[in-house]
Amino acid sequence: MLACRKPGLRPPLLLLLPLLGPLGPCSPGTPAAAAPADDAAELEFFTERPLHLVSPAFLSFTIDANLATDPRFFTFLGSSKLRTLARGLAPAYLRFGGNKGDFLIFDPKKEPAFEERSYWLSQSNQDICKSGSIPSDVEEKLRLEWPFQEQVLLREQYQKKFTNSTYSRSSVDMLYTFASCSGLNLIFGVNALLRTTDMHWDSSNAQLLLDYCSSKNYNISWELGNEPNSFQRKAGIFINGRQLGEDFIEFRKLLGKSAFKNAKLYGPDIGQPRRNTVKMLKSFLKAGGEVIDSVTWHHYYVNGRIATKEDFLNPDILDTFISSVQKTLRIVEKIRPLKKVWLGETSSAFGGGAPFLSNTFAAGFMWLDKLGLSARMGIEVVMRQVLFGAGNYHLVDGNFEPLPDYWLSLLFKKLVGNKVLMASVKGPDRSKFRVYLHCTNTKHPRYKEGDLTLYALNLHNVTKHLELPHHLFNKQVDKYLIKPSGTDGLLSKSVQLNGQILKMVDEQTLPALTEKPLHPGSSLGMPPFSYGFFVIRNAKVAACI
């Protein structure tokens, strides 16, 4: 039974679908009173013990490797504002990877771009993590040129016609310094398409990169390749799962002979679990699964070119994620049952995101629901594509302004702990009124062990109210309700928290995320098409202590 499982173990796969529904006999405590009106929904909590323990870096994010196509734009990573925003989401992994990663070649003799050189010169004789930002004239020039470079990158992505590019020691330094100064753990994706004549992986360029990073005493984790299931389409090269597994074994041997002998290795960063991809994942895990530390796969809900606002609000589309997770977990549990599973790259829509959707308030429904389902089903880490970069699914735009999903991510980081519990809504509203429950993040100064964090999405076009279970009904609750700001409604690129617009105080200061205390016994009101967090204080839940 679910109630008898140890923390951190995945429940049997047959139980995963019912997790969205009523809990049945496992639910402890006295049921709450009957809902007083049609707009009220009664909650059931399962808090006897955690379903799972996710990583403290559960919510992580990426920088797409295509940023290195023109290394001048790596200089953006010197922005103090961008670093402040990244630091707000620590602890987290920063994955550097993507399709372009398999077309990048490290050239240790390559000179840094003028913009990179200008940045490093401006940082000399200073603490690089505390010093000033990019020289203003350099930053202004790059910002003006970025929209044109963005179109180049998106065109390459849409057409799946990639060309090789080289990157320098300076680019590696810029990436590592950004991660280190932001409190992030860097995961670097190495080119897997460099092949010998007999189609084995050519590790010579990876060796050059390892040698350089070793000389700098960098602490880096590694990946090899991105979505190898699509190598044929991207590069005209077919590699089967067995060969890929052998390539990972070779990479692990390479790491073992270097300063990175204890480094983590993740993979295979495979696409969604469809027919040929499933076949590849199975054979990879059999051949090389032993040498990886976690199994990584990718997920997107919809095609960014044709996605609609209705797609972003459709509970049936949100639910498609469940079967993808189940398929992946089933494969891993059968072949490599002790391996953790990570969502190594994910967002709302593939192809760079959906224009005027993936960077708006509406995208938050997909993002928050994916976080909730991932934690509930046993995914240890979720890496959001991207923090900053080309397309529409970024957390931070081209002017380093945080977008709605950034603020949602920041609230998640501050309020949600790594012990995953269970909540459900009674009645027929489950698919459009989606709820998730964790122990509260006790690093938040206002909260303590035993507190609960409920997060919820209201996909109804009317206000709904949540009623806490009877034994928690009179507890103090802090509300963090997120709504769009301005006249664009669901398509707004700014948000308000409890009625206050969220924006940075200055380039190095994030705003306070101020709660709204509710009167004990109050229902938890949620306006139409909104999402938010509710911290139940002094809940004294034993599983959270």
From Swiss-Prot:
Its EC number is 3.2.1.166. It is a peripheral membrane protein. It comes from the Eukaryota. The keyword Nucleus applies. Highly expressed in placenta and weakly in the kidney, lung, spleen and uterus. Heparan sulfate group binds at residues 64-66, 160-164, 272-282, 298, 305, 350-352, 391-393. Residues 290-419 are annotated as: Required for heterodimerization with the heparanase 8 kDa subunit. GO terms for biological process: angiogenesis involved in wound healing; cell-matrix adhesion; heparan sulfate proteoglycan catabolic process. It is found in: Lysosome membrane; Secreted; Nucleus. Keywords: Calcium, Cell adhesion, Disulfide bond, Glycoprotein, Hydrolase, Lysosome, Magnesium, Membrane, Nucleus, Secreted, Signal. Glycans are attached at residues 164, 219, 461. GO terms for molecular function: heparanase activity. The active site is at 227 (proton donor), 345 (nucleophile). Transmembrane segments: none annotated. Endoglycosidase that cleaves heparan sulfate proteoglycans (HSPGs) into heparan sulfate side chains and core proteoglycans. Participates in extracellular matrix (ECM) degradation and remodeling. Selectively cleaves the linkage between a glucuronic acid unit and an N-sulfo glucosamine unit carrying either a 3-O-sulfo or a 6-O-sulfo group. Can also cleave the linkage between a glucuronic acid unit and an N-sulfo glucosamine unit carrying a 2-O-sulfo group, but not linkages between a glucuronic acid unit and a 2-O-sulfated iduronic acid moiety. Belongs to the glycosyl hydrolase 79 family. Heterodimer; heterodimer formation between the 8 kDa and the 50 kDa subunits is required for enzyme activity. Interacts with TF; the interaction, inhibited by heparin, enhances the generation of activated factor X and activates coagulation. Interacts with HRG; the interaction is enhanced at acidic pH, partially inhibits binding of HPSE to cell surface receptors and modulates its enzymatic activity. Interacts with SDC1; the interaction enhances the shedding of SDC1. Interacts with HPSE2. This is Heparanase. It comes from Bos taurus (Bovine). The gene is HPSE.
